[in-house]
Amino acid sequence: MGLFLILVVYFAYFAGYSSRELINNPYNKLQNLLAKSVTRGNIYSSDNKLLATTSTDSNGEEYRYYPYSEEYCHVVGSIGQGQYGLESAYNFELLSSNTGAMTKIINDFSGKKDAGDSLITTLDSEIQAAAYNALDGYDGAVIVMNSKTGAVKAMVSGPDYNPNTVSENWDEINADGSSVLLNRATQGLYTPGSVFKLITLYEYLKEGGDEENYSYDCTGSIEVDGNTINCNNGKSHGTVSLMNSFAYSCNCSFVNIGKTLSVKKIQETCSELLFGKELPVKLQSGKSSFKLQESDSDFVKAQTMFGQGETLISPMHAAILVSAIANGGTAMKPRLVESVQNDAGKEIKKYPAKEYKELFEPEMAEKLKTYMASVIKYGTAARLNQYANLMVYGKTGTAEIDSERNSNSWFIGFAEQKDTKENYTIVVVTENIPDGTYPAPAVTIAGQVLKVLD
């Protein structure tokens, strides 16, 4: 029976279908047939922690077990009532078996299942634990990614769920209005707030803005079309240079900068920076959007320049952009799996680091790094300037989301280890933070992750 099922899969491939897509389709019954001849493979962290395995209950029935429960629930995912995360994206690999030929023959004649292949992920259990514990209690997401290789070291989303009890709690999960199954790290779309100033700054420099002589006198507010735009808490920043406008996240100055920019050119820039594009990731992801038009009012244009308005971005998209700056302008393709191994530990397939594309010219990436360094040295994230073995770069953001001034809190940045020169991108977003909350939760969470990297 096992040999027959393998032939069915290969017949489908040679008939003109992709066997991978065929098996990964959750509505295809073939994967259920394969599960009768192959015991689904394990999933491991990069440091060999078991993240998912197939166990057998007292009745001899197989079930999927997740030792870390909620901690890896979104990135590893689950099977049963639907499929999510790596369990879904690598369903084909987990239901494939590259066990020894003689073992397959013996299993076929004895009616035993073949052992499925296992995934060795890029996830680091120490970094994942730090990110998970730091996010605890917040809705939002944390991503940590090696900027030079694209290897995702941690991916956490909140609220979380127990993947071991999805089937039993399916009705309750579906009735929950907080979308617990949504992986906010890849699928969440958020108003960027002041982290979008990185793109506004980039566009200003691209269009030949006067970087050296720029000066703006911030009084804490600015009028646009009869509407008042304030800096955070109405704070007056005084006379600010371009560097200090970015470091202190001066809304008024960025409104002033935005007045000089071409809407058409910033549309083109955002398109080049993957807004409105599919992201190069295996997991399901949301598509960011930049909707500013020439016909929009001056007020809408002003809001857009400091990250309010209708612009939306996912944490993974932000991570790709930041990692490109950290990597000299070139984004690496994000990856969650290092390799596939058979039950004897033999490597069947390797997923090496791959360049995705150049998003910033190297000289521009280096220049943007200096601005991001100012945020840490003396700007809005100065409390992250405390790690002996790390050079940290970043941008904070607060995006108002309702009339009560509740907001999403952001931190995007990267840290280079002074001894190893390893470079890690960090993106944090937390949802629905009450007005006046200090310190910003995203910066606090980033700090807890940085402690592990230090």
Model-derived features: where do they sit?
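Periplasmic/cell-envelope proteins involved in peptidoglycan metabolism and beta-lactam response
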Residues: 1-170, 180, 189, 214, ...
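Beta-lactam-recognizing serine transpeptidase/beta-lactamase-like catalytic domain environment
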Residues: 47, 148-194, 199-430, 438
